[in-house]
Curated annotation (Swiss-Prot):
Protein name: Glutathione S-transferase A2
Domain GST C-terminal: 85-208
Organism: Bos taurus
Alphabetized InterPro entries for the sequence: Glutathione-S-Trfase_C-like (IPR010987), Glutathione-S-Trfase_C_sf (IPR036282), Glutathione_S-Trfase (IPR040079), Glutathione_S-Trfase_N (IPR004045), GST_alpha (IPR003080), GST_C (IPR004046), GST_superfamily (IPR050213), Thioredoxin-like_sf (IPR036249)
UniProt keyword Acetylation present: yes
Assembly, per entry: Homodimer.
Keywords: Acetylation, Cytoplasm, Transferase
Reaction catalyzed: RX + glutathione = an S-substituted glutathione + a halide anion + H(+)
EC number: 2.5.1.18
GO cellular component, one term: cytosol
Biological role: Conjugation of reduced glutathione to a wide number of exogenous and endogenous hydrophobic electrophiles.
Top-level EC class as recorded in UniProt: transferase
GST N-terminal domain location: 3-83
GO molecular function: glutathione transferase activity
Amino acid sequence: MAGKPKLHYFNGRGRMECIRWLLAAAGVEFEEKFIEQPEDLDKLRNDGSLMFQQVPMVEIDGMKLVQTRAILNYIATKYNLYGKDMKERALIDMYSEGVEDLGEMIMHLPLCPPDQKDAKIAQIKERTTNRYFPAFEKVLKNHGQDYLVGNKLSKADIHLVELLYYVEELDPSLLANFPLLKGLKARVSSLPAVKKFLQPGSQRKPPMDEKNLEEAKRIFRIK
């Protein structure tokens, strides 16, 4: 029997958090090997574990996978969270990419210079309420089903619900005018595996704070 997937990253959200969410939603237990020093990253690079010299990296099924989307797609395929045919996968990919676009803006917010932060937050709020949330709300309204694609849980639902939590951390009022998204969030959050992941003490990571940011900069030698 294969061992648990092993996740190599620093002890923070970053680009690994969506992978943690997807594994957790699939009910898959995983181990984490935290990169705590720059030398830990050097070792992974020097022993050939990182194809492109970067993390996240996930050891799964005898492979050392890098590149976030490749990792997510493998997990989604393995655990039947990637639709039933090519058309469904295309929709799942399209919705996931939209989630990623807004998620990137939120993820990079801690790196924003203080004098630009208010403008960046305003831009995120505008994109959230005028571009991304209306698009996803419309998908759910048009087909009247419980999930985004094929009336079945997919990685697109999980990525979107993860994003909804991040948006709520930024400003809880942004979700107020999107009842179907609120319904999706409640539905996915009540699934036993996700509910467990949302409890305190799980492998879910907290929002990036100043201390966490400085730690990441030190590990990855970011000036």
